[in-house]
Curated annotation (Swiss-Prot):
TM spans (from-to): none
Domain of life, source organism: Archaea
Family: Belongs to the UPF0179 family.
Name of the molecule in the record: UPF0179 protein VNG_1401C
Taxonomic source organism: Halobacterium salinarum (strain ATCC 700922 / JCM 11081 / NRC-1)
Signal peptide: none
Any Pfam family hit: UPF0179
């Protein structure tokens, strides 16, 4: 399980984030090796906060940074219903301009891209919307965690 550094506001078990790589302010930081050891574009979940560790100075996080355990996590997403079952591969249906839709966060989920096929780990059922404005027949699924 990878150990990385996060700001205290994010350092809670269950918090999920997508690692986007180093910020410009990371240049020259003495903690780069411990902090920038994740895979870009992967969604992670904080599983534990290291107790007794000190808060390190950090140019990115205004309250400093603390050591946490993280692991790649599933990505809740909507996929076309046809052929969607646990164990199969699935892709996102495509971009959606309807940001007010209750399913939008699943149609364009953080940590997933439109041009990638993902392993479906689990079927969650019907998406939260009553009707898709793009007339898509969608199923809510969990994409398997990314391989490290």
């Amino acid at each position: 399980m990878p150990i990385t550094l996060l700001g205290p506001r994010l350092a809670d078990p269950g918090t999920e984030f997508v690692y986007h790589g180093p910020a410009d302010d990371c240049e020259g930081c003495p903690y780069r090796q411990q902090c920038l050891n994740l895979t870009e574009g992967v969604r992670y979940e904080v599983t534990d906060v290291r107790e007794g560790g000190q808060v390190l100075d950090c140019a990115v996080h205004d309250e400093g940074a603390v050591a946490v355990d993280v692991e790649p996590t599933t990505i809740p997403a909507t996929v076309p219903s046809k052929g969607a079952y646990a164990g199969s591969k699935g892709k996102l249906a495509g971009p959606c301009p309807h940001t007010e839709c209750p399913s939008h966060e699943f149609c364009e989920p953080a940590g997933a891209s439109f041009d990638t096929e993902y392993q479906i780990a689990e079927i969650d059922g019907e998406p939260p919307h009553d009707h898709c404005a793009l007339d898509r027949d969608l199923t809510l699924v969990e994409f398997a965690p990314a391989e490290r």
